[in-house]
UniProtKB/Swiss-Prot annotation:
It comes from Gloeothece citriformis (strain PCC 7424) (Cyanothece sp. (strain PCC 7424)). Involved in the biosynthesis of branched-chain amino acids (BCAA). Catalyzes an alkyl-migration followed by a ketol-acid reduction of (S)-2-acetolactate (S2AL) to yield (R)-2,3-dihydroxy-isovalerate. In the isomerase reaction, S2AL is rearranged via a Mg-dependent methyl migration to produce 3-hydroxy-3-methyl-2-ketobutyrate (HMKB). In the reductase reaction, this 2-ketoacid undergoes a metal-dependent reduction by NADPH to yield (R)-2,3-dihydroxy-isovalerate. Pfam families: KARI_C (PF01450), KARI_N (PF07991). Residues 183-328 form the KARI C-terminal knotted domain. Binds 2 magnesium ions per subunit. This is Ketol-acid reductoisomerase (NADP(+)). InterPro entries: 6-PGluconate_DH-like_C_sf, KARI, KARI_C, KARI_N, KARI_prok, NAD(P)-bd_dom_sf. Mg(2+) 1 binds at residues 191, 195. Residues 2-182 form the KARI N-terminal Rossmann domain. Its cofactor is Mg(2+). The keyword DNA damage does not apply. PANTHER family: KETOL-ACID REDUCTOISOMERASE, MITOCHONDRIAL (PTHR21371:SF1). NADP(+) binds at residues 25-28, 51, 53, 83-86, 134. GO terms for cellular component: cytosol.
Length: 331
Protein backbone atom coordinates (compact mmCIF):
# COMPACT_ATOMS: atom_id res chain seq x y z
CA UNK A 1 0.00 0.00 0.00
CA UNK A 2 1.42 3.36 -1.03
CA UNK A 3 2.07 5.76 1.84
CA UNK A 4 0.77 9.32 1.85
CA UNK A 5 2.78 12.10 3.49
CA UNK A 6 1.23 15.16 5.11
CA UNK A 7 2.13 18.55 6.61
CA UNK A 8 4.02 17.07 9.55
CA UNK A 9 6.30 15.21 7.12
CA UNK A 10 7.49 18.29 5.23
CA UNK A 11 10.00 20.81 6.57
CA UNK A 12 9.76 24.30 5.08
CA UNK A 13 12.97 25.27 6.87
CA UNK A 14 14.81 23.52 4.03
CA UNK A 15 13.63 26.35 1.75
CA UNK A 16 14.46 29.12 4.22
CA UNK A 17 16.93 31.68 2.85
CA UNK A 18 16.65 30.05 -0.56
CA UNK A 19 15.44 31.69 -3.75
CA UNK A 20 13.06 29.68 -5.90
CA UNK A 21 12.77 30.56 -9.59
CA UNK A 22 9.53 29.57 -11.27
CA UNK A 23 10.19 29.31 -15.00
CA UNK A 24 6.89 30.04 -16.71
CA UNK A 25 3.76 31.73 -15.38
CA UNK A 26 0.93 29.78 -16.91
CA UNK A 27 -1.61 27.55 -15.19
CA UNK A 28 0.84 25.75 -12.90
CA UNK A 29 3.44 28.51 -12.82
CA UNK A 30 1.21 31.15 -11.26
CA UNK A 31 -0.11 28.67 -8.68
CA UNK A 32 3.34 27.46 -7.61
CA UNK A 33 4.73 30.98 -7.44
CA UNK A 34 1.89 32.49 -5.42
CA UNK A 35 1.52 29.53 -3.07
CA UNK A 36 5.25 29.47 -2.32
CA UNK A 37 5.21 33.24 -1.80
CA UNK A 38 2.33 32.93 0.65
CA UNK A 39 4.25 30.16 2.43
CA UNK A 40 7.03 32.63 3.14
CA UNK A 41 9.44 31.50 0.43
CA UNK A 42 11.50 33.94 -1.63
CA UNK A 43 10.14 33.51 -5.16
CA UNK A 44 11.14 35.03 -8.48
CA UNK A 45 9.71 34.34 -11.93
CA UNK A 46 11.64 33.68 -15.14
CA UNK A 47 9.98 34.63 -18.43
CA UNK A 48 11.08 35.32 -21.99
CA UNK A 49 11.33 39.00 -23.00
CA UNK A 50 7.95 40.44 -23.95
CA UNK A 51 5.94 37.73 -22.22
CA UNK A 52 2.33 38.77 -21.64
CA UNK A 53 2.50 37.00 -18.29
CA UNK A 54 5.08 39.42 -16.90
CA UNK A 55 2.49 42.05 -16.03
CA UNK A 56 0.29 39.49 -14.25
CA UNK A 57 3.22 38.26 -12.18
CA UNK A 58 4.32 41.77 -11.26
CA UNK A 59 0.78 42.76 -10.29
CA UNK A 60 0.75 39.75 -7.98
CA UNK A 61 3.81 41.14 -6.21
CA UNK A 62 6.41 38.92 -7.86
CA UNK A 63 9.75 39.98 -9.31
CA UNK A 64 10.20 39.01 -12.95
CA UNK A 65 13.54 38.30 -14.63
CA UNK A 66 14.67 36.78 -17.88
CA UNK A 67 14.91 33.01 -17.67
CA UNK A 68 18.71 33.15 -17.65
CA UNK A 69 18.85 35.77 -14.89
CA UNK A 70 16.29 33.91 -12.80
CA UNK A 71 18.26 30.67 -13.17
CA UNK A 72 21.46 32.45 -12.18
CA UNK A 73 19.94 34.03 -9.07
CA UNK A 74 18.01 31.00 -7.84
CA UNK A 75 18.97 28.14 -5.56
CA UNK A 76 15.96 26.16 -6.78
CA UNK A 77 14.73 26.16 -10.39
CA UNK A 78 11.26 24.82 -11.19
CA UNK A 79 10.59 24.43 -14.93
CA UNK A 80 6.89 24.85 -15.65
CA UNK A 81 6.93 25.21 -19.42
CA UNK A 82 5.29 23.02 -22.09
CA UNK A 83 7.19 19.75 -22.56
CA UNK A 84 8.11 20.55 -26.16
CA UNK A 85 9.97 23.80 -25.35
CA UNK A 86 11.75 22.73 -22.18
CA UNK A 87 14.83 21.26 -23.87
CA UNK A 88 15.76 24.38 -25.84
CA UNK A 89 15.08 26.74 -22.93
CA UNK A 90 17.09 24.51 -20.62
CA UNK A 91 20.10 24.31 -22.95
CA UNK A 92 20.20 28.02 -23.75
CA UNK A 93 19.05 29.72 -20.55
CA UNK A 94 19.27 27.36 -17.57
CA UNK A 95 22.10 24.84 -17.98
CA UNK A 96 24.87 27.48 -17.98
CA UNK A 97 23.74 28.56 -14.49
CA UNK A 98 23.40 25.15 -12.82
CA UNK A 99 26.08 25.48 -10.19
CA UNK A 100 26.81 22.74 -7.69
CA UNK A 101 24.21 22.46 -4.93
CA UNK A 102 21.27 23.86 -6.87
CA UNK A 103 17.97 22.05 -7.32
CA UNK A 104 16.42 21.49 -10.74
CA UNK A 105 12.77 20.48 -10.57
CA UNK A 106 9.84 19.59 -12.79
CA UNK A 107 6.12 18.95 -12.52
CA UNK A 108 6.24 16.16 -15.11
CA UNK A 109 9.00 13.67 -15.82
CA UNK A 110 8.84 13.60 -19.64
CA UNK A 111 12.08 15.39 -20.53
CA UNK A 112 14.19 13.78 -17.82
CA UNK A 113 12.87 10.26 -18.32
CA UNK A 114 13.21 10.34 -22.10
CA UNK A 115 16.66 11.95 -22.02
CA UNK A 116 15.76 15.27 -23.60
CA UNK A 117 17.31 17.06 -20.62
CA UNK A 118 20.49 15.66 -19.03
CA UNK A 119 21.43 17.64 -15.90
CA UNK A 120 24.96 17.77 -14.49
CA UNK A 121 25.65 15.30 -11.64
CA UNK A 122 26.25 18.08 -9.11
CA UNK A 123 22.61 19.20 -8.75
CA UNK A 124 19.54 17.63 -7.19
CA UNK A 125 16.84 16.71 -9.72
CA UNK A 126 13.35 16.28 -8.31
CA UNK A 127 9.72 16.35 -9.34
CA UNK A 128 6.67 17.77 -7.58
CA UNK A 129 3.54 17.16 -9.63
CA UNK A 130 0.15 18.41 -8.41
CA UNK A 131 -2.67 16.14 -9.56
CA UNK A 132 -4.89 18.99 -10.61
CA UNK A 133 -4.88 22.13 -12.79
CA UNK A 134 -3.16 25.28 -11.63
CA UNK A 135 -6.32 27.22 -10.79
CA UNK A 136 -7.34 24.42 -8.42
CA UNK A 137 -3.86 24.30 -6.84
CA UNK A 138 -4.15 28.01 -6.13
CA UNK A 139 -7.80 28.12 -5.06
CA UNK A 140 -7.56 25.22 -2.62
CA UNK A 141 -4.42 26.75 -1.09
CA UNK A 142 -6.20 30.04 -0.41
CA UNK A 143 -9.01 28.05 1.21
CA UNK A 144 -6.58 26.40 3.62
CA UNK A 145 -6.62 23.12 1.72
CA UNK A 146 -4.54 21.66 -1.10
CA UNK A 147 -4.29 19.38 -4.10
CA UNK A 148 -2.58 15.97 -3.77
CA UNK A 149 0.87 15.79 -5.35
CA UNK A 150 3.31 13.20 -6.57
CA UNK A 151 6.98 13.68 -5.74
CA UNK A 152 10.10 11.91 -6.96
CA UNK A 153 13.88 12.09 -6.90
CA UNK A 154 15.88 11.46 -10.06
CA UNK A 155 19.25 12.62 -8.77
CA UNK A 156 20.34 13.21 -5.17
CA UNK A 157 23.58 15.18 -5.24
CA UNK A 158 23.08 16.83 -1.85
CA UNK A 159 21.80 13.89 0.16
CA UNK A 160 18.70 16.00 0.89
CA UNK A 161 16.84 15.80 -2.42
CA UNK A 162 13.92 13.78 -1.06
CA UNK A 163 13.39 16.06 1.94
CA UNK A 164 13.71 19.11 -0.29
CA UNK A 165 11.06 17.81 -2.67
CA UNK A 166 8.70 17.20 0.25
CA UNK A 167 9.37 20.72 1.53
CA UNK A 168 8.51 22.20 -1.86
CA UNK A 169 5.33 20.12 -1.99
CA UNK A 170 4.41 21.54 1.42
CA UNK A 171 5.12 25.05 0.17
CA UNK A 172 2.53 24.75 -2.60
CA UNK A 173 -0.05 23.16 -0.30
CA UNK A 174 0.32 19.56 -1.44
CA UNK A 175 0.95 18.06 2.00
CA UNK A 176 -2.36 19.46 3.22
CA UNK A 177 -4.07 16.94 0.96
CA UNK A 178 -1.33 14.32 0.91
CA UNK A 179 1.68 13.60 -1.29
CA UNK A 180 2.69 10.25 -2.77
CA UNK A 181 6.24 9.16 -3.63
CA UNK A 182 6.91 7.80 -7.11
CA UNK A 183 9.70 7.81 -9.70
CA UNK A 184 10.21 9.87 -12.84
CA UNK A 185 9.65 6.74 -14.92
CA UNK A 186 6.45 5.71 -13.17
CA UNK A 187 4.93 9.20 -13.19
CA UNK A 188 5.78 9.79 -16.84
CA UNK A 189 4.57 6.48 -18.20
CA UNK A 190 1.37 6.29 -16.16
CA UNK A 191 0.54 9.94 -16.86
CA UNK A 192 0.92 9.51 -20.61
CA UNK A 193 -1.03 6.25 -20.55
CA UNK A 194 -3.89 7.80 -18.59
CA UNK A 195 -4.06 10.77 -20.94
CA UNK A 196 -3.96 8.72 -24.12
CA UNK A 197 -6.10 5.72 -23.21
CA UNK A 198 -8.65 7.05 -20.70
CA UNK A 199 -8.80 10.73 -19.80
CA UNK A 200 -8.26 12.45 -23.13
CA UNK A 201 -7.85 10.08 -26.06
CA UNK A 202 -10.11 7.28 -24.89
CA UNK A 203 -12.85 9.51 -23.52
CA UNK A 204 -12.89 11.83 -26.54
CA UNK A 205 -13.12 8.89 -28.95
CA UNK A 206 -15.88 7.27 -26.89
CA UNK A 207 -17.93 10.49 -26.72
CA UNK A 208 -17.63 11.13 -30.46
CA UNK A 209 -18.45 7.53 -31.36
CA UNK A 210 -21.54 7.51 -29.15
CA UNK A 211 -22.70 10.88 -30.48
CA UNK A 212 -22.23 9.84 -34.11
CA UNK A 213 -24.01 6.50 -33.58
CA UNK A 214 -27.14 8.27 -32.30
CA UNK A 215 -27.08 10.95 -35.00
CA UNK A 216 -26.60 8.36 -37.76
CA UNK A 217 -29.62 6.50 -36.38
CA UNK A 218 -31.78 9.60 -36.84
CA UNK A 219 -31.83 11.03 -33.32
CA UNK A 220 -31.61 14.78 -32.75
CA UNK A 221 -27.96 15.92 -32.43
CA UNK A 222 -28.90 17.99 -29.38
CA UNK A 223 -30.20 14.89 -27.57
CA UNK A 224 -27.12 12.94 -28.62
CA UNK A 225 -24.95 15.73 -27.19
CA UNK A 226 -26.76 15.64 -23.85
CA UNK A 227 -26.59 11.86 -23.53
CA UNK A 228 -23.01 11.33 -24.71
CA UNK A 229 -21.14 14.47 -23.64
CA UNK A 230 -23.01 16.80 -21.31
CA UNK A 231 -23.84 14.16 -18.70
CA UNK A 232 -20.26 12.87 -18.52
CA UNK A 233 -19.43 15.39 -15.78
CA UNK A 234 -22.38 14.27 -13.66
CA UNK A 235 -21.14 10.68 -13.72
CA UNK A 236 -17.45 11.55 -13.29
CA UNK A 237 -18.20 13.71 -10.24
CA UNK A 238 -19.87 10.72 -8.58
CA UNK A 239 -16.89 8.50 -9.41
CA UNK A 240 -14.38 11.03 -8.06
CA UNK A 241 -16.39 11.43 -4.85
CA UNK A 242 -16.61 7.73 -4.02
CA UNK A 243 -15.42 5.43 -6.78
CA UNK A 244 -17.37 3.34 -9.25
CA UNK A 245 -19.48 1.85 -6.44
CA UNK A 246 -20.66 5.31 -5.39
CA UNK A 247 -21.64 6.12 -8.97
CA UNK A 248 -23.56 2.87 -9.34
CA UNK A 249 -25.31 3.47 -6.02
CA UNK A 250 -26.47 6.87 -7.29
CA UNK A 251 -27.87 5.93 -10.70
CA UNK A 252 -31.06 4.07 -11.58
CA UNK A 253 -31.26 0.27 -11.51
CA UNK A 254 -31.82 0.40 -15.26
CA UNK A 255 -28.59 2.32 -15.80
CA UNK A 256 -26.67 0.09 -13.41
CA UNK A 257 -27.85 -3.10 -15.12
CA UNK A 258 -26.92 -1.66 -18.51
CA UNK A 259 -23.50 -0.76 -17.09
CA UNK A 260 -22.78 -4.35 -16.08
CA UNK A 261 -24.21 -6.07 -19.14
CA UNK A 262 -23.30 -3.72 -22.01
CA UNK A 263 -20.18 -1.89 -20.85
CA UNK A 264 -17.87 -4.91 -21.28
CA UNK A 265 -19.01 -5.17 -24.90
CA UNK A 266 -17.51 -1.73 -25.57
CA UNK A 267 -14.11 -2.42 -23.99
CA UNK A 268 -13.32 -5.73 -25.66
CA UNK A 269 -10.26 -7.97 -25.70
CA UNK A 270 -9.21 -6.11 -28.85
CA UNK A 271 -9.50 -2.80 -26.98
CA UNK A 272 -7.36 -4.10 -24.12
CA UNK A 273 -4.79 -5.34 -26.63
CA UNK A 274 -4.58 -1.83 -28.07
CA UNK A 275 -4.18 -0.45 -24.54
CA UNK A 276 -1.19 -2.74 -24.01
CA UNK A 277 0.23 -1.70 -27.38
CA UNK A 278 -0.08 1.98 -26.50
CA UNK A 279 1.61 1.35 -23.15
CA UNK A 280 4.48 -0.40 -24.95
CA UNK A 281 4.82 2.59 -27.30
CA UNK A 282 5.16 4.82 -24.24
CA UNK A 283 7.59 2.53 -22.42
CA UNK A 284 9.83 2.08 -25.46
CA UNK A 285 10.06 5.81 -26.09
CA UNK A 286 8.27 5.52 -29.44
CA UNK A 287 5.61 8.07 -28.50
CA UNK A 288 8.21 10.47 -27.10
CA UNK A 289 10.30 10.29 -30.28
CA UNK A 290 7.19 10.83 -32.40
CA UNK A 291 6.15 13.85 -30.35
CA UNK A 292 9.62 15.39 -30.38
CA UNK A 293 9.99 14.95 -34.16
CA UNK A 294 6.51 16.39 -34.76
CA UNK A 295 7.47 19.54 -32.88
CA UNK A 296 10.87 19.79 -34.54
CA UNK A 297 9.18 19.73 -37.96
CA UNK A 298 6.81 22.57 -37.09
CA UNK A 299 3.78 20.52 -35.95
CA UNK A 300 2.16 20.00 -39.38
CA UNK A 301 0.28 16.86 -38.39
CA UNK A 302 -0.57 18.19 -34.93
CA UNK A 303 -1.99 21.40 -36.42
CA UNK A 304 -4.05 19.49 -38.98
CA UNK A 305 -5.50 17.21 -36.30
CA UNK A 306 -6.42 20.20 -34.15
CA UNK A 307 -8.21 21.84 -37.06
CA UNK A 308 -10.04 18.65 -38.01
CA UNK A 309 -11.21 17.97 -34.45
CA UNK A 310 -12.38 21.57 -34.02
CA UNK A 311 -14.65 21.09 -37.04
CA UNK A 312 -16.34 17.93 -35.71
CA UNK A 313 -20.16 18.30 -35.69
CA UNK A 314 -20.29 17.78 -31.93
CA UNK A 315 -18.45 21.08 -31.45
CA UNK A 316 -21.04 23.12 -33.34
CA UNK A 317 -23.94 21.41 -31.58
CA UNK A 318 -22.29 21.97 -28.22
CA UNK A 319 -21.56 25.62 -28.93
CA UNK A 320 -25.21 26.31 -29.82
CA UNK A 321 -26.55 24.39 -26.82
CA UNK A 322 -24.21 25.98 -24.29
CA UNK A 323 -25.24 29.43 -25.54
CA UNK A 324 -28.78 28.58 -24.42
CA UNK A 325 -27.80 27.34 -20.94
CA UNK A 326 -28.80 30.18 -18.62
CA UNK A 327 -27.05 28.55 -15.66
CA UNK A 328 -23.82 28.26 -17.65
CA UNK A 329 -23.95 31.95 -18.60
CA UNK A 330 -24.23 32.88 -14.91
CA UNK A 331 -21.29 30.64 -14.03
Amino acid sequence: MARMYYDEDGNLDLLANKTVAIIGYGSQGHAHALNLKDSGIDVIVGLYPGSKSAKKAEEAGLTVHSVADAAAKADWIMILLPDEVQKSVYKQEIEPHLKEGKVLSFAHGFNIHFGQIVPPPTVDVVMVAPKGPGHLVRRTYTQGEGVPCLFAVFQDASGQARDRAMAYAKGIGGTRAGILETSFREETETDLFGEQVVLCGGLSALIKAGFQTLVDAGYQPELAYFECLHEVKLIVDLIVEGGLANMRDSISNTAEYGDYTRGPRIVTDETRAEMRKILQEIQSGQFAREFVLENQSGKPGFTAMRRQEAEHPIEEVGKDLRAMFSWLKKA
